[in-house]
Amino acid sequence: MATVNKQAIAAAFGRAAAHYEQHADLQRQSADALLAMLPQRKYTHVLDAGCGPGWMSRHWRERHAQVTALDLSPPMLVQARQKDAADHYLAGDIESLPLATATFDLAWSNLAVQWCGNLSTALRELYRVVRPKGVVAFTTLVQGSLPELHQAWQAVDERPHANRFLPPDEIEQSLNGVHYQHHIQPITLWFDDALSAMRSLKGIGATHLHEGRDPRILTRSQLQRLQLAWPQQQGRYPLTYHLFLGVIARE
């Protein structure tokens, strides 16, 4: 696992908080796919772990659940609170949840655990706070995501410009000893140009790099090279994510 600077991650998402939802197409599509995998029953107590601005917290609250919205980023929780998205708001780390054991019917975490330093620890914590017969439902990104971004940057420099995500077999190793179902699904978003595609990453706070960031500003010539190197289809610029969707049944 890469060393993870939680303060830097929280700061990156904090900067994106006010404009997060307008860039959150990936999160919405991912949530819809995970909802389709969930056992169809009533969930009365829900943890939204990595809640962001509270879109899914509001979804569960509208279905009459008692919702706890948890996020590493205080500005994200401010956005969630302004929307009256949850019943309780909690600043906290998924790898060390400040919550009692066996509290929730559902621990929901959509595109958050990829920011954790140790996936096994994060999943164990989500499992811990779920009651017997409850469910942990999560999505994360897997190796092979953002191939267009990686390809385009190779025309400019050799530095990493997006995090490397775990391969599916390593994610499954983190699920050893529990009953789970999983599915891997690609999602491709389309943009008018390469800059818009990259701005979508910044707009959801996903520009933090575990290895550190090159502070230099992108020059006009670099942007032109990126634009030319980015694979296109009919004049549109794709950005592809590979999702791992998992549903764990608590015994």
Curated annotation (Swiss-Prot):
Domain of life where this protein originates: Bacteria
Whichever gene encodes this chain, its name is bioC
Q: Which CDD domains match?
A: AdoMet_MTases
From the UniProt record, list the reaction(s) this protein catalyses: malonyl-[ACP] + S-adenosyl-L-methionine = malonyl-[ACP] methyl ester + S-adenosyl-L-homocysteine
Q: What are the recorded GO MF terms, alphabetically?
A: carboxyl-O-methyltransferase activity; malonyl-CoA methyltransferase activity; methyltransferase activity; S-adenosylmethionine-dependent methyltransferase activity
Q: What's an example GO BP annotation here?
A: biotin biosynthetic process
In Swiss-Prot or TrEMBL terms, this protein is called Malonyl-[acyl-carrier protein] O-methyltransferase
Q: What does this protein do?
A: Converts the free carboxyl group of a malonyl-thioester to its methyl ester by transfer of a methyl group from S-adenosyl-L-methionine (SAM). It allows to synthesize pimeloyl-ACP via the fatty acid synthetic pathway. E.coli employs a methylation and demethylation strategy to allow elongation of a temporarily disguised malonate moiety to a pimelate moiety by the fatty acid synthetic enzymes.
Q: Pathway, per Swiss-Prot/TrEMBL? A: Cofactor biosynthesis; biotin biosynthesis
Top class in the EC scheme: transferase
Q: Which organism is it from?
A: Escherichia coli (strain K12)
Q: In which family does this protein belong, per the annotation?
A: Belongs to the methyltransferase superfamily.
EC numbers: 2.1.1.197
Q: Provide this UniProt record's keywords sorted from A to Z.
A: Biotin biosynthesis, Methyltransferase, S-adenosyl-L-methionine, Transferase
